[in-house]
């Protein structure tokens, strides 16, 4: 197949081997293990997964599918579809955030220009659509939800992207790096505002994330991975020179 199987329980439902965009985040463990005494083949698996995902998991404009399905016998690509997004062809914000973070991370480990170029492509689409569809620097859960700016927000996607941009700005050339850093800082400012801070409302840091909108689950909620990437982004920004 060239990718890691994500959901064995859905092989029959989806009609093949399935890989979700979230899996890009897991490749860091393979790279780290290969670099720290593990089997070097783990690195090959990670690179092959990133290559295959780059080839089949994205539309021409750089927008991603949540799920890619492959034939279980010969491995050919069958279809791209959504699971947690609005539609198969829509721009689900958190899925795109996994792609941005994932390819920035793959470039960190490989230093292969093709991965940096692709990270910037998927990032630039996200930033463009964000400005078209949101009233601030935190996206609506899916940028093609017909409710537009009235759709639920997803702070978790903003946290993932902010952290990724603070890494990506180191690798991007000149003006683009400055654009990425400024965007990340604006995201963190919004996330740190009264609109998104939980304060004494619950034990989380952040409000207004969306987990699985189609299933009616975790809509306008506090989600632990939003807090995780929010803290990671803040730490990355603090480590930079002013």
What are these regions (language model features)?
Residues 1-242:
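Glycan-recognition and catalytic cores of secretory/periplasmic carbohydrate-active enzymes
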